[in-house]
């Protein structure tokens, strides 16, 4: 069985610095010190289909290969994937 880990990415609107959050709320400043980014990617987001911020990365843990296979999806595609609907790459 594959384990789903959702990682949301947000970037500074001024300098474009990208940060990722996984499960825990994180407070972080971009290197340019021009924007403070707050947020978290909790499992509840997946259950409620309440996914904010794009793009997002869905990590699928592949037990057979003992590695991590990942694919980048737009937020709408993640929701479609979770519902079992067709999506665009």
Model-derived segments and their meaning:
Residues 59-89:
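Non-catalytic, surface beta->alpha helical segment in thiol-disulfide oxidoreductase systems
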Residues 13-14, 41, 73:
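Short alpha-helical
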Residues 49-60:
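Structural micro-motif
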Residues 19-22, 49-51, 72-73:
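Short, glycine/charged-enriched secondary-structure capping and boundary segments
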Residues 1-28:
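Local sequence-structure signature of Cys/Sec-based thiol-disulfide redox active-site neighborhoods
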Residues 4-7, 55-57, 78:
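Hydrophobic beta-strand residues in large extracellular and virion-surface proteins
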Residues 45-49, 82:
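Short amphipathic alpha-helix with an adjacent loop that forms part of the alpha/beta core around
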Residues 6-9, 30-44:
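Thiol-based oxidoreductase modules, predominantly thioredoxin-like and allied folds used
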